[in-house]
Curated annotation (Swiss-Prot):
GO terms for molecular function: NADH dehydrogenase (ubiquinone) activity. One of its GO terms (cellular component) is mitochondrial inner membrane. Its EC number is 7.1.1.2. Pfam families: NADHdh (PF00146). Core subunit of the mitochondrial membrane respiratory chain NADH dehydrogenase (Complex I) that is believed to belong to the minimal assembly required for catalysis. Complex I functions in the transfer of electrons from NADH to the respiratory chain. The immediate electron acceptor for the enzyme is believed to be ubiquinone. InterPro entries: NADH_UbQ_OxRdtase_su1/FPO (IPR001694), NADH_UbQ_OxRdtase_su1_CS (IPR018086). The chain crosses the membrane at residues 4-24, 82-102, 115-135, 161-181, 187-207, 222-242, 247-267, 268-288, 311-331. This is NADH-ubiquinone oxidoreductase chain 1. The keyword Membrane applies. It comes from Metridium senile (Brown sea anemone). Belongs to the complex I subunit 1 family. The keyword Protein transport does not apply.
Length: 334
């Protein structure tokens, strides 16, 4: 009995350490992504960005974190207290859970599920509930309208993302994320044969994460700040962390599905987490560049882009890829 309890304790400690090894670097990455975004936007707009706190502003995320987490938690008088507080916690928790199946290298993953890509899509889809909860519980018309917009936008573009993922799955024959990466080890990443699909996935990822030019949920001239307008201090910080964790997650998925994950683009260089980080950083830089370069779309244009363009195109690519694979050499083994 004692041996069993001892083994259970050891196993629990092992699981906690694996989770912390993933979560702590992720939180640091999210913190410094905010600084990187402000710096890049600053240089694109002919200014320097944050450069006062620490050397070259490197301590700015720490200062922002201390400021937000030490402020008073202000709860609106008519808000539903439990749902109001639970929404940012749920959003942040789901943003972390999705990382449980993301491999940084072969074997470097918390849980290498056989249905890993489906798990990631499912967890990402559930996050829309946290946004709806925040908009409804705030008892604010601006927050509620922002939440409805966000829900409609995220649910719509998840359809496109799902069909695009099916296209890649057809080429691989597996829902396992590690196998999706290894299927590209022959030297041809899926970005090249599936270039239009990759472009649609990136645009859908922008819409899924509510980023410019699809940031209709926080149109300052209309909704002040969107679904989180009534949030401040720690609760606002949790929404903020969840949003940027989701951006990094979608960048990682783009890298995994179309850019070969941790595989090296140069034959005589060994692949690894460094290559995975470089490719993901490049996709994140594209997110920031798009924000600095393109104006916000109208809401009707946003919805028309999906339902009239991306949905038929992504469905057509599913049929085309399946037909080509079946006609030429048969579908990959399941």
């Amino acid at each position: 009995m004692r041996k069993f309890v001892f083994l259970m304790i050891i196993e629990t400690i092992h699981i906690i350490l694996k989770i912390l090894i993933i979560v702590i670097p992720l939180l640091v990455a999210v913190a410094y992504l905010t600084l990187a975004e402000r710096k890049v936007l600053g240089y694109m707009q002919a200014r320097k960005g944050p450069n006062v706190v620490g050397v070259y502003g490197l301590l700015q995320p720490l200062a922002d974190g201390i400021k937000l987490f030490t402020k008073e938690l202000v709860i609106p008088h008519y808000a539903n207290l439990f749902i109001y507080v639970a929404a940012p916690v749920l959003s942040f928790t789901l943003a972390l859970i999705a990382w449980g199946v993301i491999p940084y290298d072969k074997g470097v993953v918390i849980s290498d599920l056989k249905i890993g890509i489906l798990f990631t899509l499912a967890v990402s889809s559930i996050s829309v509930y946290a946004i709806l909860m925040s908009g409804w519980a705030s008892q604010s018309k601006y927050a509620f309208l922002g939440a409805i917009r966000a829900a409609a936008q995220m649910i719509s573009y998840e359809v496109s993302i799902g069909l695009i993922i099916i296209t890649v799955i057809l080429c691989v024959g597996s829902l396992n994320i590690t196998e999706i990466v290894l299927a590209q080890s022959s030297g041809i990443w899926f970005f090249f044969p599936l270039f239009p699909v990759a472009m649609m996935f990136f645009a859908s990822a922008l819409a899924e994460t509510n980023r410019a030019p699809f940031d209709l949920t926080e149109g300052e001239s209309e909704l002040v700040s969107g679904y989180n307008v009534e949030y401040a201090s720690m609760s606002f910080a949790l929404f903020f962390l969840a949003e940027y964790a989701h951006i990094i997650l979608m960048s990682c998925l783009t890298t995994i599905l179309f850019l070969g994950g941790w595989l090296s683009p140069i034959v005589f260089f060994k692949g690894g987490p460094a290559w995975f980080g470089l490719k993901t950083s490049f996709i994140i830089l594209l997110f920031i560049w798009v924000r600095a370069s393109f104006p916000r779309m109208r809401y009707d244009q946003l919805m028309a882009l999906l339902w009239k363009s991306y949905l038929p195109l992504s469905l057509a690519f599913v049929v085309l890829v399946a037909s080509l694979l079946f006609g030429l050499n048969g579908l990959p083994p399941s």
